[in-house]
């Protein structure tokens, strides 16, 4: 007799659970208090098992619209931000009351891309989250919609869930949605689409199946979840994408039951510092490399020398994070640059021995040192 597979969540001591808007709101009529209480009860059960849980929850804008009496989602950014500000009050109150029923305290954490892009703020957020977890508090995380603009948005709570997973070095990321998990095609369009129960995070076939980087929605909005799992895998975290409509899905996963799609972390695990560099979603520029430089980075573990750079794109300063791309524009690495863009343009295609002659001085022989870059291919 073959034993049933055990969910990767069963052994997770620290995990991040992301709950989408449809799982905490009442069809556009604000928060569903019963649903909020349901999630609180499950997380409380995990706490009793000695597990640490961070909850990434949507729902602020929907709650704000309900409180303001708006039936139609506004298109003006400042009105959306106002709705988020109003709704965050209700979201926090609902979770605070629900967790209090189980003797647990909650904390609100609102993050922006700039919080995570700045190294000092990143470390402060990390330390605060660790402190809350040690205290037995349940952190409830959301993007700070009240202050962000389209240019600096994290983008979605799937991405935020992965970033928080990396931030606290969680063992697992659980992305709860209104679908069963991943399919080989959109099940809403193809009822015969095959369900995927297990796969490897970072499998390029999954991204292609979901429509690729330019597809927008992809198969049922799954592309962002696949990319989030890939991001989380680089800190060693497994990801489960499952339906939040499943009864007691969190506690059942923790008991070892296989629900949804498991994406196992088989990618190289990055150090915390390299994870921070990789998690930059807003890059300051790009360096286009020749084939020799690409191979030196990918296969030889070398630093990036100016002679291997054929083009400098964007305006950036020394110490900014920029991407390294091949001639086709595909990113292969990213990291901290030793020279501002103006100087990088002057020394590109030149050997390091000529840097002093060109610039008058030499900060470093490399444009990007191998200790300050991370392979992202």
From Swiss-Prot:
One of its GO terms (cellular component) is cytosol. Residues 284-362 form the PUA domain. Substrate binds at residues 58, 145, 157. InterPro entries: AceGlu_kinase-like_sf, Asp/Glu/Uridylate_kinase, G5K_ProB, Glu/AcGlu_kinase, Glu_5kinase, Glu_5kinase/COase_Synthase, Glutamate_5-kinase_CS, PUA. The keyword Transport does not apply. PROSITE patterns: GLUTAMATE_5_KINASE (PS00902), PUA (PS50890). Pfam families: AA_kinase, PUA. It is found in: Cytoplasm. Its EC number is 2.7.2.11. GO terms for biological process: L-proline biosynthetic process. Pathway: Amino-acid biosynthesis; L-proline biosynthesis; L-glutamate 5-semialdehyde from L-glutamate: step 1/2. Signal peptide: none annotated. ATP binds at residues 18, 177-178, 219-225. Belongs to the glutamate 5-kinase family. Catalyzes the transfer of a phosphate group to glutamate to form L-glutamate 5-phosphate. NCBIfam families: proB (TIGR01027). This is Glutamate 5-kinase. It comes from Bordetella avium (strain 197N).
């Amino acid at each position: 007799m073959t034993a049933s597979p055990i969910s990767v969540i069963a052994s997770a001591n620290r995990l991040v659970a992301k709950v989408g808007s449809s799982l905490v709101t009442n069809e556009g009529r604000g928060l569903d208090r019963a649903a909020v209480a349901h999630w609180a009860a499950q997380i409380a059960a995990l706490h009793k098992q000695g597990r640490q849980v961070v909850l990434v929850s949507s729902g602020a804008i929907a709650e704000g619209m309900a409180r303001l009496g708006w039936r139609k989602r506004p298109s003006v950014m400042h009105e959306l931000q106002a709705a988020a500000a109003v709704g965050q009050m209700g979201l926090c109150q609902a979770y605070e009351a629900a967790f209090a029923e189980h003797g647990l305290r909650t904390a609100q954490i609102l993050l922006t891309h700039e919080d995570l892009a700045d190294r000092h703020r990143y470390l402060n957020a990390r330390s605060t989250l660790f402190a809350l977890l040690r205290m037995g508090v349940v952190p409830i995380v959301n993007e700070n919609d009240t202050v962000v603009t389209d240019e600096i948005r994290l983008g979605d709570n799937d991405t935020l869930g992965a970033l928080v997973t990396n931030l606290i070095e969680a063992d697992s990321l659980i992305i709860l949605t209104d679908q069963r998990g991943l399919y080989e095609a959109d099940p809403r369009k193809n009822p015969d689409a095959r369900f995927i129960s297990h796969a490897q995070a970072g499998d390029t076939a999954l991204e292609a199946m979901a429509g690729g980087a330019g597809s927008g929605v992809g198969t049922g909005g799954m592309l962002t979840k696949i990319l989030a799992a890939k991001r989380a895998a680089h800190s060693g975290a497994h990801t489960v994408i499952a339906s939040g409509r499943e009864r007691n899905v969190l506690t059942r996963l923790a008991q070892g039951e296989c629900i949804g799609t498991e994406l196992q972390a088989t990618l190289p695990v990055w150090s915390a510092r390299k994870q921070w560099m990789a998690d930059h979603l807003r890059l300051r520029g790009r360096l286009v490399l020749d084939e020799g430089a690409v191979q030196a980075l990918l296969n030889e573990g070398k630093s990036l020398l100016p002679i291997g750079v054929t083009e400098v794109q964007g305006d950036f300063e020394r110490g900014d994070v920029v991407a390294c791309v091949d001639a086709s524009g595909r990113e292969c690495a990213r990291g901290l640059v030793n020279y501002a863009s103006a100087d990088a343009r002057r020394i590109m295609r030149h050997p390091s021995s000529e840097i002093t002659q060109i610039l008058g001085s030499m900060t470093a022989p490399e444009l990007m040192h191998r200790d300050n870059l991370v392979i992202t291919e």
